[in-house]
Amino acid sequence: MVAALLGGGGEARGGTVPGAWLCLMALLQLLGSAPRGSGLAHGRRLICWQALLQCQGEPECSYAYNQYAEACAPVLAQHGGGDAPGAAAAAFPASAASFSSRWRCPSHCISALIQLNHTRRGPALEDCDCAQDENCKSTKRAIEPCLPRTSGGGAGGPGAGGVMGCTEARRRCDRDSRCNLALSRYLTYCGKVFNGLRCTDECRTVIEDMLAMPKAALLNDCVCDGLERPICESVKENMARLCFGAELGNGPGSSGSDGGLDDYYDEDYDDEQRTGGAGGEQPLDDDDGVPHPPRPGSGAAASGGRGDLPYGPGRRSSGGGGRLAPRGAWTPLASILLLLLGPLF
C-alpha cells in the first residue's frame, strides 16, 4: 500500500511535476543541508524520498508507481486545487472516516495502489517518514481514503469514531456462529441483489434480521477495503438502491461518490454502450428471458437517448422505479465465490 508518494500526481493533467523529479529535487536539497553522519532514516523508517528512490530502482515497483501516478492523478488534481497536488492538505479533513461518507476513490486508483503494494519496495512507501516535506505530508492525507483498510480506523475502533474495514468486519462475523449463519442465508437469498436485478422479500427479511445482530450490523457500517473492494461497493450500492430505495453516498457503510471521478474514467465506455445499445434489440424479461415489446416510457427517448441496454444483453433493473442497473454488475456466483474467498487474501 502506498500513502507517501511525494507529489503523487505523477503525470497528472495540467502539467504537474512528476513525482520522481520531485523526489530527486528533495534528495539534492536534503543532501546539501543534512549534517555529516546523519542517517537517511528515522530509526527504522525510511525517509519517503529514499523509499521512492528504492522503488524506482526496482523495475516492478517503478512500473507500478507509474501506473499509480496515472490512475490516481485525478484524485490529487480534484482535491488538491487543480494542478497543485501539494495543496491537497487544505482540502482534506484529518479524518478519512468523515470524508468517506461523501467521496469514493476511483477503482482504477485503488487497483493501482494494490498492485504497487504487491511489489517488493512498494509497501515501504506507506510506512516512510515525510520528515519536514509538507508536499509529502499533504499527499499522504490526499491518498489515504484510497488505501485498503482491514481494521478499525483508529485504536478506539468504530465506537471511538473510527471506521472499520469490511474485511475485518467479515472476519468477526465468521467467528460468530449466529452471524455466520445469517451471512450464509444472505448469500443464499440475495443473489439477485448481487447482480443488480431486484431485492426479494426474502432477501429484505434476511437483511433486517442481520441489522439486529451487533456483529452482522458491522457489515452494514463498514467501509469496503482490500482486494474485493470494488465488488463490495457494488453489492452495497445495489442493496441500498434495490432493498431500501436509498441513494449511495449518505450512509456510513459506503465510500460515497458524487460521480465526478468515476465519470472521468467511464466516458469512453459510455460512448461504446450508446453505440451498441442503439439497435433494435428487444429487452428480455428478468425472469423468463423471453423478448417482450418495449415497456411504456422506456427506450432511448425516456432515458435521454441512451437506449434500453445499460450494461448487458437486455438486462435492466426491475427495482427502483425503472432506473438503470449499475454497469459491470457481477453475477451472483462470482460475487459469492469472491466474498467467500475474501478472508483468504
Curated annotation (Swiss-Prot):
Residues 319-345 form a propeptide. Specific growth arrest protein involved in growth suppression. Blocks entry to S phase. Prevents cycling of normal and transformed cells. Binds 20(S)-hydroxycholesterol (20(S)-OHC). Residues 254-328 are annotated as: Disordered. Glycans are attached at residue 117. Keywords: Cell cycle, Cell membrane, Glycoprotein, GPI-anchor, Growth arrest, Lipoprotein, Membrane, Signal. This is Growth arrest-specific protein 1. Residues 260-271 have a biased composition (Acidic residues). Residues 1-39 form the signal peptide. The keyword Metal-binding does not apply. It is found in: Cell membrane. The gene is GAS1. One of its GO terms (molecular function) is oxysterol binding. GO terms for biological process: cell fate commitment; cellular response to vascular endothelial growth factor stimulus; developmental growth; negative regulation of mitotic cell cycle; negative regulation of protein processing; regulation of apoptotic process; regulation of ER to Golgi vesicle-mediated transport; regulation of smoothened signaling pathway. It is a lipid-anchor; GPI-anchor. Disulfide bonds: none annotated. Transmembrane segments: none annotated. It comes from Homo sapiens (Human). GO terms for cellular component: membrane; plasma membrane; side of membrane. A lipid is attached at residue 318 (GPI-anchor amidated serine).
